[in-house]
Curated annotation (Swiss-Prot):
This is Large ribosomal subunit protein uL15. InterPro entries: Rbsml_uL15_N, Ribosomal_uL15, Ribosomal_uL15/eL18, Ribosomal_uL15/eL18_sf. Binds to the 23S rRNA. Residues 33-46, 142-154 have a biased composition (Basic and acidic residues). Keywords: Ribonucleoprotein, Ribosomal protein, RNA-binding, rRNA-binding. GO terms for biological process: translation. It holds the Pfam family Ribosomal_L27A. Belongs to the universal ribosomal protein uL15 family. One of its GO terms (cellular component) is cytosolic large ribosomal subunit. GO terms for molecular function: rRNA binding; structural constituent of ribosome. Part of the 50S ribosomal subunit. Residues 1-29 have a biased composition (Basic residues). Residues 1-59, 135-163 are annotated as: Disordered.
Length: 163
């Protein structure tokens, strides 16, 4: 049965109240009326925008400060995370950081003062961390992963210089 046939005998033919089909007031205006005021929410832009970094360039970096390592060294030795040696203490930063083994890179930052001789093994060090360790007669040792990252960085630097 057609809509026209179904609406026979109906006073308003599906328009609700008899007032609703008069003018354009029931619709809030005709066409694009009100698009900057009362119908503004209907005109938000859709779709993608912006820039997404390629997944291969993204790295999950976990950080730890020298201050934390130096202050907590006694607890770390007690828990078996750090080892005491003749020259001082040996710490693997991956063991200290909560998600160290899940992270792509574990980086040591240079905040704080170092009072103990620390030999820290990590994937990356900030310049200030390396300097602070040198001043305290400590050592910054790159892990295997850190050496791979350095090699990658050097190869990309050479490619950039050629182009």
């Amino acid at each position: 049965m057609s809509k026209k046939r179904r609406q026979r005998g109906s006073r308003t033919h599906g328009g609700g109240s008899h007032k609703n089909r008069r003018g354009a007031g029931h619709r809030g205006g005709r066409g694009n009326a009100g698009r900057d005021k009362h119908e503004f929410h209907n005109h938000e832009p859709l779709g993608k925008s912006g820039f997404k970094r390629p997944q291969k360039t993204r790295r999950d970096v976990e950080t730890v400060n020298l201050r934390e390592l130096d202050e907590d060294i006694a607890v770390l030795v007690e828990d078996g995370i750090a080892e005491e040696s003749d020259d001082g203490y040996v710490v693997d930063a991956r063991d200290v950081v909560e998600d160290g083994y899940e992270a792509d890179v574990v980086k040591v930052l240079g905040a704080g003062t170092v009072y103990n001789e620390l030999e820290i093994v990590a994937d990356a060090f900030s310049e200030s961390a390396e300097q602070a360790l040198e001043v305290a007669d400590g050592e910054a040792v790159l892990s295997e992963r850190g050496e791979e990252l350095e090699a990658e960085k050097d190869s990309t630097d050479e490619e950039d210089e050629e182009s």
